Regions:
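FAD/FMN-dependent oxidoreductases across multiple families
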Residues: 1-35, 70, 74-78, 158
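Helical substrate-recognition/capping region of FAD-dependent monooxygenase/halogenase enzymes
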Residues: 49-171
């Protein structure tokens, strides 16, 4: 549980949990720290907006649902790591003919381990995928990845993520 609202009850939460208080797992690839920081970031900006009167308190209802999805992914990833780490190596892996499973697992989970694989479903905050055509090359609800770009006006190289700074304004 990420809040104090009992299953089936319809009210705004008053108590929240984050990080290892609500998802404990074995430390294998460092993803737990990233997920914990994402929990608190997700809750923090919502609390600020509600307390400053910028958002309706019902916004706080989205925290538990969003983070529960990520916590489930964390536990699933942990189980995959356990299976890979406990499985015996194959002859092909020992001969070097096949990349070791642990390396493949690490590569397959780089975004999750690095804390950039966040994907939120349609909700109070995210538009339905019916609007996906408006965001070509980006998946609605997924974390935006910065990219190197060249500004046309002066040919200056820069990171796109540095241009769109987080300033707490809705756009």
């Amino acid at each position: 549980r990420f809040d104090d609202v009992p299953e089936g009850e319809d009210r705004n939460p008053r108590v929240f949990t984050a990080g290892d208080a609500c998802h404990t797992h074995s430390p294998k690839a460092g993803q737990g720290m990233n997920v914990s920081m994402q929990d608190t970031f997700n809750l923090g900006w919502k609390l600020v907006h509600v307390l400053q009167g910028r958002a309706n308190p019902s916004l706080l209802r989205s925290y538990s649902k969003e983070r529960l999805t990520e916590a489930k992914r964390l536990v699933e990833t942990d189980h995959k790591w356990s299976r890979v780490m406990s499985a015996p190596t194959t002859q092909a892996e020992r001969d070097g003919a096949e990349e070791p499973r642990i390396i493949r697992q690490f590569k397959d989970n780089l975004e999750f381990t690095g804390g950039t694989a966040v994907k939120y479903d349609t909700s109070y905050l995210f538009a339905a995928s019916a609007h996906q055509a408006l965001a070509k090359g980006e998946e609605i609800g997924r974390r935006f990845h910065s990219a190197p770009v060249v500004r046309v006006s002066d040919a200056k190289q820069m990171q796109l993520g540095h241009v769109a700074e987080a300033d707490a304004r809705w756009r």
